[in-house]
Design a protein with these regions (language model features):
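Short, well-ordered coil/turn residues at beta-beta hairpins
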Residues: 35, 89, 204-206, 308
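Glycine-rich phosphate-binding loop and adjacent beta-alpha segment
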Residues: 210-270, 308-312
Length: 312
């Protein structure tokens, strides 16, 4: 079996390439991909070659962990039926390239447990579940606070704000880009230069800007917390006395876990978590090179979705 996949051959160089799929196991499903999202966080670092080294890192690679498709074949022990629309957070099904994270392809073979059923009506919005789960993970553990300041109004920042409002919060969001200050429902987005507050109890940073830590610590109330929920490609540091005076806490929010993903799928399915207004750009998967350059170079692009429905 063959699949057409996006392959990063090296930084800033990609091609649509035919790759072999493995034979299906008894508990596997074959999925024809309908949509995949382009991540402007980790995937951007893979694209431009600035991803810090980690085990398994290298080129060529198949990117993607935001995939929506439909089950077209299922093994005897698979838990999903043919025809089910699913979300897949990446795959490990390609041998001719590294799977980082292996979801941007026309067809995938994955364990049925890795393909999560989603509401039929969500369609392309299903690609947003990885970001939604990341947002949920940052502030859902027992004892964690909802943020009263969120730094960055991209898709992840908007997800965190929507979840905070859903939990009864009233967050403020910073964004330096005037074009990114629209789209708020139930919270306020402001230019950080106009904010004089220095009593935030919980600040969640999703900007990925390593140099902001001193500024954020200076905005904390005593005993306040900075949550680092972005991805940072350069070292972070901070001046100690202001953090000491506030007895500041710094917490790293890593990627989501399976319960986080299940939680946001349920919230969206119940109509509690809106995914509207977050996908701004769409491109046929055959135009992937142009799509990636738009996703990473156009400040007006919140989320780019690739349409695979015409790709074999």
């Amino acid at each position: 079996m063959q699949s057409t996949a996006i392959v990063f051959q090296q930084p800033k160089s990609l091609a649509l390439t035919g790759l072999s799929l493995p034979e299906m196991g008894a508990a596997d499903v074959k999925v024809e991909v309908e949509f995949s999202g382009i991540s402007t966080g980790t995937e951007r670092l893979l694209w431009d070659g600035t991803m810090p080294a980690f085990p398994g890192m290298g080129y060529p690679l198949v990117p993607g962990y935001e995939t929506v498709g439909r089950v077209v074949d299922a093994g005897d022990q698979a838990t999903l039926k043919v025809g089910t629309r699913v979300y897949i957070p990446g795959s490990q099904c390609f041998q001719e390239a590294k799977n980082l994270f292996g979801g941007s392809a026309s067809k995938l073979v994955v364990p049925s447990a890795r393909a999560l059923p989603i509401q039929e009506s969500l369609a392309e919005q299903g690609v947003l579940f990885a970001l939604a789960a990341t947002a949920y993970h940052a502030h859902s553990a027992p004892g964690t606070k909802q943020p009263d300041l969120i730094v960055g109004h991209g898709v992840l920042g908007r997800m965190i704000a929507r979840l905070a409002v859903l939990a009864g919060g009233h967050p403020v969001v910073w964004d330096t880009n005037p074009a990114r200050r629209s789209g708020a429902v139930g919270y306020e987005v402001i230019d950080p230069s106009t904010d004089t507050r220095k009593n935030y109890k919980c600040i969640c940073d999703v900007s990925g800007v390593s140099s902001l830590l001193d500024e954020l610590i200076g905005r904390l109330a005593p005993g306040g917390e900075v949550v680092l929920a972005g991805f940072y490609d350069t070292p972070l540091s901070f001046v100690f006395p202001p953090a000491f005076m506030r007895e500041a806490r710094i917490r790293v929010a890593a990627q989501w876990s399976p319960p986080d993903l299940a939680a946001v799928i349920a919230l969206a399915g119940d109509g509690l978590l809106s995914l509207d207004g977050l996908i701004t750009h769409r491109q046929d998967a055959t135009q992937a090179d142009a799509a990636y350059r738009t996703a990473f170079g156009d400040a007006d692009c919140l989320k780019m979705v690739l349409d695979w429905r015409q790709v074999t």
